[in-house]
Amino acid sequence: MTDFGSFEAQAQALAQPLSQTEKAAAVLLAMGKSIAGKLLKFFTQSELQAIIAAAQSLRAVPPHELEALVNEFEDLFTEGAGLMDNAKAMESILEEGLTPDEVDGLLGRRATFQSYEASIWDRLMDCDPVIIAQLLAREHPQTIAYVLSMMPSSFGAKVLLQLSDKQRPEILNRAVNIKNVNPKAAAIIEARVIEIIEEMEADRNSPGPAKIAEVMNELEKPQVDTLLASLETISTDSVKKVRPKIFLFDDILFMPQRSRVQLFNDVSTDVITMALRGSAAELRESILASIGARQRRMIESDLAAGDAGINPRDIAIARRSITQEAIRLSASGQLELKEKEPEAA
């Protein structure tokens, strides 16, 4: 039997006049994608979005009405009038005339690769290569080779350099000859890598160690040493989290020479002079050896005049500005705060 209720609803829908946007959608659909696609560039972004919305809810358009619509548009002709799947047809037209990114934007979608979460190997790049190398050094060479082969090359190179000279040849050989890895073994390794990343991200995002390090960086070395020793009696783990974030003026002595040169390259003569007042002879010499001869003579001349009338607070501020710059440059990978420890024999 005929569904008269449905028939009546369709009749009422056909009686409703089309809006200008609906007319445009109907004509574009009737043209076919090759012709309609060429016309899309003449519409603005907002107009295209309105036409897409209209096409998705467009009622059935009978041939005689469609003919009348087409007559409203000069120089246009129909290329088939199948309007059964308006949404799909409009998508096809968009793909004909626009780039994939533009189509995705108009349809409110994004390509899978764009929305897909960054892989665990890309996330590793936010970690400290020194710590990653220390963790990997405990693993089997084949595991290390697999992890290095999966890392972004720039980060993998940094990690490789942190591994011992004794380990590198075997790891490189295994990485060169690595073949299909057992999926189960790969899944186990990747699960562990995810755990490491999450642990490191949690530590990095924790405000506690960073805040305590900031406080200690304002103190003198004897005070910091005393506080760390006291903290170590309570929690060795807490000391391990805080100590790497602490960098005092006296620690400049333990920087690699090339890093010292880079650090003081952009520090003004006045700041260096103020920071060196009252400093130990060995530290002073290490800093003066990192600057140009002319600048060194000027600083030595000022220091020879003595420290009379110098405010200790100004000395502390100058030293703090230098250590802050060192921490900043280290965080960006431009220098090293400490010499690498010699490898065990």
Curated annotation (Swiss-Prot):
Keyword Cell inner membrane: yes
Database matches in InterPro entries: Flg_Motor_Flig, Flg_Motor_Flig_C, FliG_a-hlx, FliG_M, FliG_N
Pfam family, one: FliG_N
Annotated site residues (Part of the EHPQR-motif) in this chain: 174
Entry keywords, A to Z: Bacterial flagellum, Cell inner membrane, Cell membrane, Chemotaxis, Flagellar rotation, Membrane
Any one of the GO CC terms: plasma membrane
Any one GO BP annotation for this protein: chemotaxis
Bilayer topology term: Peripheral membrane protein
Major place of residence: membrane
Record SUPFAM superfamilies: FliG
NCBIfam families: PRK05686.2-1 (NF004260)
Database matches in PANTHER family: FLAGELLAR MOTOR SWITCH PROTEIN FLIG
Main function: FliG is one of three proteins (FliG, FliN, FliM) that forms the rotor-mounted switch complex (C ring), located at the base of the basal body. This complex interacts with the CheY and CheZ chemotaxis proteins, in addition to contacting components of the motor that determine the direction of flagellar rotation.
Protein name, as recorded: Flagellar motor switch protein FliG
